Amino acid sequence: MIIMLFKKLSDVSEAEMQRLISRGSGLADVGDTVSAVLSDVRMKGDAALREYTKKFDKVELANFEVSEEEFEKALSEIGSELLGHLRIAAENIRAFHRAQMPETTWFMELQPGVVLGQKATPLESVGAYAPGGRASYPSTVLMTVIPARVAGVEQVIVCTPPRADGSVHPLTLAAAKVAGADKVFKLGGVQAIGAMAYGTETVPRVDKIVGPGNVFVTSAKMQVRDIAEIDFPAGPSEVLIIADESADAAMAASDIIAQAEHDPNAVSVLVTTSETLAEEVEQEVLAQAESTARSEIVKISLENAAVLIADSLDQCIDFSNKFAPEHLEIMVEDSDFVLDRIKNAGSIFIGNYAPVPVGDYASGTNHVLPTAGYAKIYSGLNINHFLKYSSIQKISKSGLESLKETVIALAEEEGLKAHADSIRARFGYRPSK
């Protein structure tokens, strides 16, 4: 029996609301386990990788790096049609992220003799994590590697878990080729994050690690961020749908099921101003859950789901901003009214014909997004995650002279006389010996 929360939003208890808002907060529960694995990888390198790959993936590997022969075999196995679809998705992702690219270097004249600017520089190396396990995720390879390449990152590697026979799914390898990854390693879980953060005999250390994963992977990313920068916490998938009476119940239900099939911990919520729609969606969800291919996972996941009835669109929007969803679908007649008031969302999908899966695969927007409420403080993966910025100042003597008194006054007020003297030195001052 599927137990899904179905209530008027105003009747949701404080405990129920807290469960919805603070979803996915299991990092502390696995922290010690993750820390131990990371420590082993840091100290033992490849030996630890072999140990944990055998323990968790149930496979012994002679080599972690995918060979050129394995890439060629993968490309021959998937066929030209599927490869063509990968290339379509890749080109859309590439085009969208190219549009995000800032001007590499720009300048402005603040005042005569004072020219300020900014220079964007790509990171030197990035490691992309692509989950495995229940399914292969070649789309994640595209979403992580392509923006890094567009940004101009010099070295991009991928880590993804091996299958039981020690291979990587051919579609994942094909995606790595299409996206332009330099190397792919058969490594998953915490040990993969540790390898990319610390470096081993085989796996190069990277400047930044990006990509989603389970609670163990997310915890590992959080723990290594003093060594390698990360994108953001990206855990079990989630969707929030804001709908009114104009929405299609079957479509909304199918989007709830689509999220639920990701993971038993996935979260799907509908908040609507229409009680009729709420009832129809609930019935559709229960029916579709029985017939969908991954029914067992879906039914477990739906225990985290909710159908909520709001008094107004304003109440829907207020709930959404508190929930801060990874994916937000807006299925209302006046979508602009809602969009203008949304503050916190990883990626937004507007209309009955913009379901989350189109963004997951091929529209071009990025599907690596903050979850568990982190959309309040993080943006989804974008070109800026692969760039760093240096400010520039070009100042002439006359320009410095116009700022001289201000700088000297502020420096001396802070008790930093040498700062003030460095300004005076440009105008003939020499400190006494």
Curated annotation (Swiss-Prot):
State the GO CC annotations.
cytoplasm
Name the GO terms of the biological process aspect.
Answer: L-histidine biosynthetic process
Question: Matching Gene3D superfamilies, A to Z?
Answer: 1.20.5.1300, Nitrogenase molybdenum iron protein domain (3.40.50.1980)
The entry's free-text remark on the cofactor is:
Binds 1 zinc ion per subunit.
The signal peptide here is none
Supply the alphabetized keyword list: Amino-acid biosynthesis, Histidine biosynthesis, Metal-binding, NAD, Oxidoreductase, Zinc
Pfam families from the xrefs? Histidinol_dh (PF00815)
Superkingdom:
Archaea
Binding positions for NAD(+)? Y129, Q191, N214
What is the protein's name according to its record?
A: Histidinol dehydrogenase
Species of origin reads Methanosarcina mazei (strain ATCC BAA-159 / DSM 3647 / Goe1 / Go1 / JCM 11833 / OCM 88) (Methanosarcina frisia)
